[in-house]
Amino acid sequence: MTSTFSSLDVSAFTSAADRILAEAVTGDARVPGVVAMVTDRDRTVYSGAAGQRSLGGSAPMTTDDVFAIFSTTKAITATAALQLVEEGLLDLDAPASTYAPAIGTLQVIEGFDDAGEPILRAPKSVPTTRQLLTHTGGFGYDFFDEIYNRLAEEKGQPSVTTASRAALMTPLLFDPGERWQYGTNIDWVGQVVEGLRGKRLGEVFAERIFAPLGIENMSFILREDFRSHLTEIHARNADGSLTPMGLELPSPPEVDFGGHGLYGTVGEYMKFIRMWLNDGVGEGGRVLKAETVEMALRNHLGDLPVTMLPGVIPSLSNDAEFFPGQSKSWSLPFMINNETAPTGRPAGAQGWAGLANLFYWIDRQNGYGGYWATQILPFGDPTSFTKYMEFETAFYDALKS
């Protein structure tokens, strides 16, 4: 790949980043605690923690603390699928039902009749794995979609946070390929991977991704050794105050949900980011071929736009969008910003987020990536997201200097 090797003023960035983290955990609108890191191709160049693991608790936040990483799980599932493509086992453009038969039974919901019953029809096609990876498969989330929310409230459709097989079995919202809509697509990619490997997704990750990356502290199971370092998920109340939620994802889960189910540390995620910065190579071996990385990170969405995420369930998400007014696309694992972002992130960089206000970016042009981790609901928390944007901006300011 063509790269520009920029020089980071590490001292200036460390000073600015430490200040931003300290500000984030101070004042009435504070976050309880935050961990943030930046890596270059070789090592973590900034690692910071501020605040507390749980509001009112005595444990300070540390860089070794464990987070529910929510949708930052998705890119790891995409990586497992890309390995199958390399091996000639997965055809991205074949119906996903070839590998995960249950997806072929799902119908399209067109709304509700006068009696409140779902109006269903057969889809024009079964989603392909490529469509699932690019969020054009037809799925949504109940916290971002009114129809799914109504199915949950009136018909008892289980939430994905139950980690149950029943939670996967939602109708499609539209015919595959029609538009981009963020949803449970990557959970189905996980089912494709399991169908081809004959193993649970967590086992596939451990053997084929975590081992060559040297990742030990990441799992779909909330291990006992994680509990002593587990960061509490908090709710941001309407008045801006915070309440510990006591929320945990089911462990062990009935299904390893490839869209959101991992627990892990930010330091371990740095190893995953470094793999993308190094054309597929981890510290213990190759995860993806360089040509696979290049193929995967192109725009696979065509002219379809990535749109704002509407906060349908206010306790889970605000209206949220990266870089409003700017064009965004989707690669196979990530969102692509098509224009230079206000933070300084260059056009063509990759990134995404997790529901509890976790955010990351991967800038292969300059050879850096970063991750900002908090545990707050709803998504799009004004303090966490704003401070993340300041953190990323401070990085690019120090890179230019």
Swiss-Prot record:
- What up-regulates or down-regulates this gene? Induced by propane, 2-propanol and acetone.
Q: Does the keyword Mitochondrion apply?
A: no
Location of the active site:
S71 (nucleophile), K74 (proton acceptor), Y182 (proton acceptor)
| UniProtKB keywords | Hydrolase
Q: Which InterPro entries match?
A: Beta-lactam-related, Beta-lactam/transpept-like, Diverse_Enzym_Activities
Q: What class of enzyme is it?
A: hydrolase
Q: Which is an annotated GO molecular function term of this record?
A: hydrolase activity
**Family the UniProt entry places it in:** Belongs to the class-A beta-lactamase family.
Q: What does the function comment of this entry state?
A: Plays an important role in the metabolism of acetone derived from propane oxidation. Catalyzes the hydrolysis of methyl acetate to acetate and methanol.
- This chain's protein is named Methyl acetate hydrolase
**Source organism:** Gordonia sp. (strain TY-5)
Q: Which gene encodes it?
A: acmB
